[in-house]
Amino acid sequence: MDKSLFEQARPILEQIQDNGFEAYYVGGSVRDYVMGRNIHDIDITTSATPDEIESIFSHTIPVGKEHGTINVVFNDENYEVTTFRAEEDYVDHRRPSGVTFVRDLYEDLQRRDFTMNAIAMDTAYKLYDYFDGQQDINNRIIRTVGIAEERFQEDALRMIRCLRFQSQLSFDIATETFEAMRIQMADIKFLSIERIVIELTKLMRGINVEKSFNHLKSLKAFNYMPYFEHLDMNQINVTEAIDLELLIAIVSVKFDINYSLKPLKLSNRQVKDINQYIQIMNALPSIITKEQLKMFVYDYDTHLIKNVMVAADVLKANDIQGHEPLIVNLQTIDETLHRLPMHNRKDMMVNGGVLMAHLNAKSGPWLKDVLRQIEIAIVTGKVSNEETEILKWVDNHVKI
């Protein structure tokens, strides 16, 4: 089992210990280590206060000092070091009203969300598991630390995280944990949509997404999320992992809607991808010739095209017509892309200025139309991408 990331962080823990404080690895990295999975981010918990951590290390960043977290920069890597803490009453089902620093590891671990995430480990790889997290991992069970209702009242996002972990790890959810989610799911309406979107993005890429997505529906989670709250999500089926952006596009096509995406507070890139996914799904069924395929591959991001094609079963499960496999398949997409004479309008050997000078015409709506006609002619092989040939083609085929 690869311990290299733990070993890279070991000097940080040892330096904290050399100064008279406790320090442990904690959270997802320990969970994944116990499961035999690849380790990613290393989180460290300690009895030292943020001020004490800053005094121990020469290069620190106070990213969340008021909450007990200091970034320690070591060998050009950032490590989150968080003081043992007990959280006070939560407000709005999403954040504690205050944080109290403590010196006891048990007190710190008991505030965490799930037993599998509440295991600490020292530099000798000894585990500190006060809540039977290893047993739950071995039994493939997601269970809250302590009383489920209390954990979800503290932070309603934990319910969505629970389903995300189920999707990623293919674990079952403990009965009492699931029942608490059923009772308290409405509390997610107090959360920021940004936090929900982060969890949904990970959930949709999980190996067991079908089960978790069905739980989202049965628990009526979508009823309390902006954008989705106006839709009958029970009609949407997800049978395999897809991007969240593709899910939103499928919803738009399935219900033939054009709702604003602003309530989801997505990035410009995400909105652009969703709109392309919608256009791709609408265009796919009509592609029956090689010329149409060339323009399709030219007009759209081939990565997104392939995502839609790979998700053919999801489209079918939502009664969305897919592609004609003899014309459009992964091989023909790659071959067509490789053979395109150009890949965007910037590659074209004429521009608007050249056209206006050649035709002795002022700019106007005609220009955009003619440039598109030239694009199509070049991509479909009707004219070569050379200025003299293009202008000759314009003289013979274009009227303004």
From Swiss-Prot:
ATP binds at G28, R31, R112, D155, R158, R161, R164. Signal peptide: none annotated. CTP binds at G28, R31, R112, D155, R158, R161, R164. The keyword Iron does not apply. Its cofactor is Mg(2+). Its EC number is 2.7.7.72. Coiled coil: none annotated. It catalyses: a tRNA precursor + 2 CTP + ATP = a tRNA with a 3' CCA end + 3 diphosphate; a tRNA with a 3' CCA end + 2 CTP + ATP = a tRNA with a 3' CCACCA end + 3 diphosphate. One of its GO terms (molecular function) is CCA tRNA nucleotidyltransferase activity. GO terms for biological process: RNA repair; tRNA 3'-terminal CCA addition. Keywords: ATP-binding, Magnesium, Metal-binding, Nucleotide-binding, Nucleotidyltransferase, RNA repair, RNA-binding, Transferase, tRNA processing. A single active site specifically recognizes both ATP and CTP and is responsible for their addition. Catalyzes the addition and repair of the essential 3'-terminal CCA sequence in tRNAs without using a nucleic acid template. Adds these three nucleotides in the order of C, C, and A to the tRNA nucleotide-73, using CTP and ATP as substrates and producing inorganic pyrophosphate. tRNA 3'-terminal CCA addition is required both for tRNA processing and repair. Also involved in tRNA surveillance by mediating tandem CCA addition to generate a CCACCA at the 3' terminus of unstable tRNAs. While stable tRNAs receive only 3'-terminal CCA, unstable tRNAs are marked with CCACCA and rapidly degraded. Homodimer. This is CCA-adding enzyme.
